[in-house]
């Protein structure tokens, strides 16, 4: 079951209404005492329904979780799909310049602040979640993958696991590398990161180098 409604969201140009999607597992209603881990996701319009997806094809997450009977809540928020690359601003934690897109004042830190201080508490109040760090995950692809990676490193006291699918490391590889060096990760932190072998530019090589940096970084806490 997927619930869908709108919330006030701190958008690039002020506050606007955004669609929120919350998936509840098949056994949610049958056992009113049971609580569940939560996966927070970016680009919510692409997570569940083809009719809402940006390019007409969703990830089909609800279908997969129903099929596998996975005990997991998924909470997702749609992005700003405006014509002026607002999504790049909303999902970048850093300012950056790009020869194709120009200059962007990244608002990703404000986006994450809303997720942690507004959205997560709302989900925890209104659904039977396991709100602790161990059971709180985050995921996304492309710019959403970048935000998931950033969230795991910067807010490791909130998120214990992240899925960063083809993360847009190109936005600011130097600042991300610095964040890896500074991050104090709790034991048991898990990151899934992938990339395609036929992606444009040097994205594959950049992600491979970053994966090696993550793997060799002595960041977990004692």
Regions found by a protein language model. Name each.
Residues 1-37, 72:
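A domain-start/cap signature at the N-terminus of enzymes
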Residues 50-104, 112:
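Active-site machinery of serine-nucleophile hydrolases
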Residues 78, 165-166, 194:
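Alpha/beta-hydrolase-fold catalytic nucleophile elbow
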Residues 96-137:
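Gly/Ser-rich "nucleophile elbow"/oxyanion-hole loop immediately N-terminal to the catalytic nucleophile
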Residues 134-177:
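Primarily recognizes the serine-hydrolase "nucleophile elbow" in alpha/beta-hydrolase
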Residues 170-214:
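The feature captures the conserved acid-bearing segment of alpha/beta-hydrolase catalytic domains
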Residues 215-222:
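Conserved small/polar residues in nucleotide/adenosyl-binding loops
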